[in-house]
């Protein structure tokens, strides 16, 4: 049986490419997004409001082996108050997934967590975000690491730089 992966934000620019790559590897893929304009014929669409689904969200999503959490609002509006407003929603989603039994979660971060930095950047570069977006993403990274440790899950943080296409 193929590994099951759920992708949040599957209809976004990055999400579409992630879903295609996972399907090409023969994985069983489920997708969630507010807007799924593009049809993923081999992916299972899950119609769930991620941020209002309750504590049993993991069951509602079909208990996938892994979740790739890409969903985010106003990513290109760096000082939108939506970043701070939505942070608790992301926290509760991730907590409820892990509490429900999820053992592997990957979350999309951003170069904006690091802030302004000259020189090479690696996993040990200190984060000094300079926008509400960067502050929120950095906070979610720290929260997710704490929750993954608490629930014995594997956490992977994906930090993207200069997405073009």
Language model segments and positions:
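Conserved Rossmann-fold NAD(P)-dependent oxidoreductase catalytic core, especially the SDR/UDP-sugar
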Residues: 92-132
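Conserved glycine-rich Rossmann-like NAD(P)H-binding loop of the short-chain dehydrogenase/reductase
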Residues: 27-38
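Active-site Tyr-X1-5-Lys
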Residues: 130-156
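Flexible, glycine-rich beta-alpha linker
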Residues: 114, 131, 156-165
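SDR active-site strand-loop-helix element
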Residues: 8, 32, 67-70, 105-111, ...
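N-terminal Rossmann NAD(P)H-binding glycine-rich loop of SDR-like oxidoreductase domains
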Residues: 5-25
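Rossmann-fold cofactor-recognition segment
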Residues: 41-53
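NAD(P)H-binding glycine-rich loop region in Rossmannoid oxidoreductase-like domains
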Residues: 50-88
């Amino acid at each position: 049986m193929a590994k099951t992966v759920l992708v949040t934000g599957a209809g976004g620019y990055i999400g579409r490419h992630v879903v295609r790559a996972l399907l090409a590897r023969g994985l069983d893929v489920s997708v969630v997004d507010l807007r799924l304009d593009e049809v993923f014929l081999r992916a299972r669409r899950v119609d769930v409001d991620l941020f209002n689904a309750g504590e049993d969200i993991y069951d509602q999503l079909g208990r996938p082996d892994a979740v790739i959490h890409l969903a985010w609002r106003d990513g290109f509006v760096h000082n939108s108050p939506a970043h701070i407003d939505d942070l608790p929603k992301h926290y509760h989603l991730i907590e409820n997934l892990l509490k429900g039994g999820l053992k592997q979660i990957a979350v999309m971060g951003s170069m904006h967590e690091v802030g302004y930095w000259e020189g090479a950047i690696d996993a040990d570069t200190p984060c000094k975000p300079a926008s509400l977006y960067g502050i929120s993403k950095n906070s979610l990274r720290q929260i997710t690491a704490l929750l993954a440790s608490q629930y014995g899950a594997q956490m992977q943080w994906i930090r993207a730089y200069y997405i073009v296409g």
